[in-house]
């Protein structure tokens, strides 16, 4: 074939290469995307996916992926132009660079919404994506793992289809590969699958916990983030899964050490996992306590602020809820002051709610537990948030429940006195019941109660409260001589002055 004949073909090929590469480069900068879209670039790139030159196919796919990644509108354009089907057809070719770019397109489309992810699945992409997990090239495996992850994350139906495509075993094998980027992608995708429900978490746990838990001690921050989140997403669904995770971790110290990590997200995800573990059974809570967990958790909530504290605070509450000795371990770890700090100083109401929940469970077991909590002056704070009209409904509920739990075991009457003057009727009932329980026959407490204004307060409110509360006040009054009760009554001074006035008038006559 003469040079004159070949030259136009060579120039045409060079032009296609230049065009596809230039568009891929332009699409890497967000400020160019709208102009490219307006120029109809998607329709021009589509035929290049079937080009005979592999580098052109690859550049075209990369450009389409970058365009789809930019917006949902462009991702929908990829679906509407039937580009996904074309990519799936081309995946049968052995070009690893094109396979990586095609997986990137699937990820870029699927990430925007469940509907677009479903379009990718309905186009038949799952089987070739799972096959890409078995490719020799780790970058192809990584791209496929991310695409499967972005499909799985939206809902349980899509994640179930990924599981049914036999992706889980291949993803677990990817975790065992030496490439760190591939490990990260596999761990994140398994986490997306496991997050939805127990049925999806179970195959991940059955086949992968030995491998997954090994990486708790791995020296890579992003991987540890993903692993802690993955373990939490497995654990959260049931006590059985939590037990499986604990059995495979073997030494809880490995997980607790993640709370000491230099990276805040590792710490947050580890706290999430621990929170889900201790919530599921007293045995799990005991294992964490035996490994020194309360002290490490307290250090965690001391040194971190904002939302990550939530999981640590809830963990202390869950541990304390099960048994009195576990609650005492939380007290001995000096948790109460940090819980009080969260209640008083955290700006987020859901964290205040968690602090109320934890303090309520710490203080509910016995008079000793209650005293430790009430001595920290948290009862007044809880009552304040319960009565504050700006508090959320959840904060009010948690504060009310915690107050009742702690007060019902409180023998430290001096800590109840400040509440007596401001407590609403439903809390006042619990306070009065404690006075009835501990004042009777205790002359020291009776004197203190009278001298500190408590007895006088009861006389002031006696006629303003409902009959049930009047009965309780009457029972407390019965512990004192009648003249003492009369002395602290609101009308006593007026009655006395009337007597004086009456006596003076008689003398003048």
Q: Predicted regions: what is each one?
A:
Residues 8-11, 49-52, 91-94, 133-136, ...:
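Alpha-solenoid helical repeat architecture
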Residues 17-30, 44-47, 58-70, 89, ...:
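Alpha-helical solenoid repeat architecture
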Residues 2-5, 44-46, 86-88, 128-130, ...:
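Buried hydrophobic core positions in alpha-solenoid tandem helical repeats
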Residues 1-3, 20, 30, 42, ...:
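Residue-level signal for cytosolic alpha-helical hairpin/rod architecture
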Residues 1-35, 47, 485-509:
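N-terminal "cap/leader" segments of large eukaryotic alpha-helical scaffolds
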Residues 25-38, 42, 47-54, 66-73, ...:
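Short helix-loop boundary/capping segments at the starts of domains
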């Amino acid at each position: 074939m003469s040079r004159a004949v070949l030259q136009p073909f060579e120039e045409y090929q060079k032009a296609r290469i230049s065009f596809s590469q230039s568009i891929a480069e332009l699409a890497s900068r967000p400020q160019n995307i709208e102009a490219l879209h307006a120029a109809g670039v998607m329709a021009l790139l589509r035929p290049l996916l079937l080009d005979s030159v592999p580098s052109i196919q690859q550049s075209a796919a990369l450009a389409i992926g970058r365009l789809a990644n930019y917006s949902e509108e462009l991702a929908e354009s990829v679906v509407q132009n039937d580009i996904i089907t074309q990519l799936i057809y081309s995946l049968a070719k052995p070009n690893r660079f094109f396979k990586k770019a095609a997986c990137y397109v699937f990820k870029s489309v699927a990430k925007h919404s469940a509907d677009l992810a479903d379009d990718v699945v309905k186009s038949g992409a799952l089987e070739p994506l799972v096959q890409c997990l078995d490719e020799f090239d780790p970058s192809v495996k990584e791209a496929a793992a991310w695409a499967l992850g972005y499909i799985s994350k939206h809902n349980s139906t899509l994640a179930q289809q990924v599981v049914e495509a036999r992706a889980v075993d291949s993803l677990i094998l990817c975790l065992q590969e030496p490439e760190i980027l591939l490990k990260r992608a596999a761990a994140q995708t398994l986490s997306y699958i496991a997050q939805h429900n127990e049925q999806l978490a179970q195959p991940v746990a059955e086949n992968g916990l030995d491998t997954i838990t090994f990486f708790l001690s791995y020296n890579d921050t992003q991987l540890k983030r993903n692993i802690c989140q993955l373990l939490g997403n497995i654990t959260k669904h049931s006590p059985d899964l939590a037990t499986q995770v604990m059995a495979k971790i073997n030494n809880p110290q490995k997980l607790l050490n993640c709370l000491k990590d230099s990276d805040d997200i590792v710490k947050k995800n580890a706290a999430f996992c621990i929170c889900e573990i201790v919530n599921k059974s007293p045995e799990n809570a005991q294992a964490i306590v035996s490994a020194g967990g309360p002290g490490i958790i307290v250090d965690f909530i001391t040194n971190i602020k904002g939302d990550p504290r939530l999981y640590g605070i809830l963990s202390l509450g869950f541990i304390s809820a099960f048994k009195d000795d576990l609650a005492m371990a939380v007290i001995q770890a000096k948790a109460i002051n940090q819980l009080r700090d969260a209640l008083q100083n955290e700006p987020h109401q859901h964290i205040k709610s968690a602090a109320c929940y934890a303090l309520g469970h710490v203080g509910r077991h016995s008079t000793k537990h209650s005293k430790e909590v009430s001595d920290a002056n948290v009862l007044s704070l809880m009552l304040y948030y319960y009565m504050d009209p700006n508090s959320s409904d959840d904060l009010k509920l948690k504060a009310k429940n915690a107050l009742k739990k702690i007060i019902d075991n409180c023998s430290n009457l001096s800590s109840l006195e400040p509440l007596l003057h401001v407590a609403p009727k439903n809390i006042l009932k619990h306070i009065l019941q404690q006075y009835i329980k501990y004042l009777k026959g205790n002359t020291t407490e009776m004197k203190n109660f009278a001298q500190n204004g408590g007895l006088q307060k009861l006389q002031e409110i006696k006629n303003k409260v409902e009959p049930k509360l009047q009965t309780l006040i009457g029972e407390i009054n019965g512990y004192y001589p009648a003249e003492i009760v009369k002395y602290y009554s609101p009308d006593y001074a007026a009655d006395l002055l009337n007597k004086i006035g009456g006596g003076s008038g008689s003398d003048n006559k």
